[in-house]
Amino acid sequence: MNLAIRGIACNLGEKAADTFHDDQHKDLKADFIMANPPFNQKAWRAENELTADPRWHGYDVPPTSNANYGWILNIVSKLSANGMAGFLLANGALSGDGTELNIRRQLLNNHLVEAIVILPRNMFYSTDISVTLWILAGNRKARTVEQNGELVKYRNRENEVLFIDLRQWGEPFEKKYIQFSKEQIAQIA
């Protein structure tokens, strides 16, 4: 609905469906992905469901108790070789143990995590918690690519992860919310 209101053309699939159980874009490989999946979604699959799902290939199966890492691996599975993804998750996704720790470790070993940005509380209408912006990149190796008719050189960033803690940043907005000023956005970028 949000996309339609804004006049943004998109392909959401042939029907309304549960992304995990009826993937409408099985073969999709995207250059850019932006997502705001439900935070800490409980009971998103039964214990014996989706255990051999190809989206988890090379990773542990995400726990049934919380879909955060199911969402992350769904996004990873959709990235093109040089794709970039940005998505929001609850901060707790940074510290889960067991299976979540193993998946997080494998994301790092696969050199996919470009940046982790912790945002201030009260930035969103739907929750007052601090959330984290994850940035993933499919190719972090040194390379030269043509963009808009110009050659752009990227240095090797495979063994680097940028961490930014912005929990103390922002300014009041509509009395109970926080937003970044234009100056702060320029400084962060």
Regions found by a protein language model. Give the residues of each.
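A conserved structural/catalytic subdomain of Rossmann-like adenosyl-cofactor enzymes
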Residues: H21-D23, D27-A189
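S-adenosyl-L-methionine
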Residues: M1-L28
